[in-house]
Structures are given as structure tokens and as C-alpha cells.
Amino acid sequence: MTGFSLDPRLQADTVPVCDLQLSAVRLMRDSHYPWLVLVPGRPGLVEITDLDETNRARLMEEVALAARALKAVTGAHKLNVAALGNRVRQLHVHVIARFESDAAWPNPVWGGPRMKPYEAGEMDALVERLRAALGQHSERG
């Protein structure tokens, strides 16, 4: 990841889960929704199309892996996957567990209720469960 640095907003809004071959997997601090963010560890990326063909395919595999792990850990009714980048230009992909009972359902999470921090220990427990689900595929588990 030479020359790579995480955008300060992503750094502030997320905590590390693990590193996959291409991407850092991070958990949003918002307890309204179990929400992963995958950030490819290459400098200067804004769009998915900025990745070469090999890394673009790798990113899609890592998104699928993260989505399967998140669904297995949370029992989500639906997964939302998006790469927007309107506020944070650094390429990152959101993988969000959605529930019919969640604070924004059925609308998008953006523009919903204000961020709600996890209770003490709750975020750490979720990170550990996600690491276990992703562990056999990560470079750091």
C-alpha cells in the first residue's frame, strides 16, 4: 500500500476489521446499520474504473465476500452495495446490512437518522464476529 493513505473522514467514521488482498475492510461507527466499507489500498483511486481489470475483478470478489460475511453475521433481510463518493472522493464501496425494522427502511440510509454510536463493547463484539467470518480470507485476521 505504498503511497496510500486513508481519507481522514473514512478514518474518523470507521474502525478497522481486516485487510484483504486489495482492500481494507472497515466498520462504520453507526449502530443503526451494520455497515462495512471496503477501501482499495491503492493511491489516487476515485472510480471503480480507475482500477485495472485484475484489481477491478478482485474488488468485486472482495465485495461479495464482505457481503456474504455481513449477511451471515447479522441475518440481514437485504444488503445495499454502493460506491458513491460524492462527499469522500477516495474510492470506497459501502456494504450495508438492512432490516425491515431499521431506522431508514425502506429508504436509503443516507439522509436518515443521525449517526448513533455503538454501546460499549457492542462494536468490538461485531468486529470480532466479522473478523471470524472473513478471517480465512484475510491477510490480517
Q: PLM features: residue spans?
A:
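HIT superfamily nucleotide-processing domains
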Residues: M1-G141
